[in-house]
A protein has these predicted regions:
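Amphipathic alpha-helical coiled-coil segments
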Residues: 1-77, 84-95
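Amphipathic alpha-helical coiled-coil scaffold segments and their short linker/junction regions
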Residues: 101-106
């Protein structure tokens, strides 16, 4: 009986660690995602400015092209973070013991 109690306690502690790890990862990714969203907005503003400056002959095409490249990199990083957020939410849900939602009827 004591062995069963110890095994149960170990199982509960393992579950708590899994929940804590999943929540920590998810929280960190949420913070990173917010930073990446801000970087995307700043990159979009920089690209718009570079594009307008190029259209008015105030800068060369390479400056506008570099700003666009930076924007695309920021968008990609933000999209990848969005995917990690979704996976992190799945990990939290699984750690909490929730069952996946059933497939809708066709």
């Amino acid at each position: 009986q004591q062995e069963a109690a110890v095994a149960y306690q170990q199982t509960v502690l393992k579950a708590w660690h899994e929940i804590d790890d999943a929540l920590s990862s998810y929280t960190a990714e949420r913070q990173r995602n917010a930073q990446l969203a801000a970087m995307e907005v700043a990159s979009r503003d920089a690209w718009e400015l570079a594009r307008v400056r190029y259209q008015h002959g105030m800068t060369d095409f390479l400056v506008a092209l570099d700003a666009q490249r930076t924007l695309l990199q920021a968008q990609r990083a933000h999209a990848e973070s969005n995917a990690r957020l979704a996976l992190g939410l799945v990990a939290v849900t699984k750690a909490l013991g929730a069952q996946p939602a059933p497939e809708p009827a066709a």
